[in-house]
Amino acid sequence: MQNPPDYRNDTVLPLPLEVTADAWAVDAACSGNPGPMEYQAIDLATGARVFHFGPMKGTNNIGEFLAIVHALALMQQQGQTQKTIYNDSYNAILWVKKRQCKTKLERTPQTEPLYQIIQRAERWLNTHTWTNPIIKWETKKWGEVPADFGRK
């Protein structure tokens, strides 16, 4: 696949040569910590948004974790077992590998809906296997991850 593919319909800069276009980039944003959190995935081949979730009260790390799990589950559902996932959060990637969200967010009536989603994600991780590469997006070398919300 050409990098970037000539049919990309967005204004994202060309991908770094080390980055495969057969991939989704996922990222989260949170206004405050905790605060309103949301996440999304962008298809690197087309620049199209694959999914978006939120906002709901949470933390950035939780959003990054859930974005990766959401991408894994959707890819598995679509039979895309080799598509790469890029994410810029070392913690989230580690949590997915350990199949557990190690958040310190206080569990309160306000955060309970998010905790239910976290439990569902952990249950999915513990009952499924995947072969999709999950790769740390190297922001210092490559610039912001294409799924970035641009709020810094």
Language-model-detected regions and their locations in the chain:
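Short intrinsically disordered terminal tails
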Residues: 1-2, 152
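RNase H-like nuclease fold core
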Residues: 2-62, 74
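RNase H catalytic domain
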Residues: 30-33, 73-151
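Flexible, glycine- and charge-enriched loops at secondary-structure boundaries
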Residues: 57-61, 65, 107, 111-114
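Alpha-helical metal-binding/catalytic segments enriched in His/Glu/Asp
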Residues: 67-69
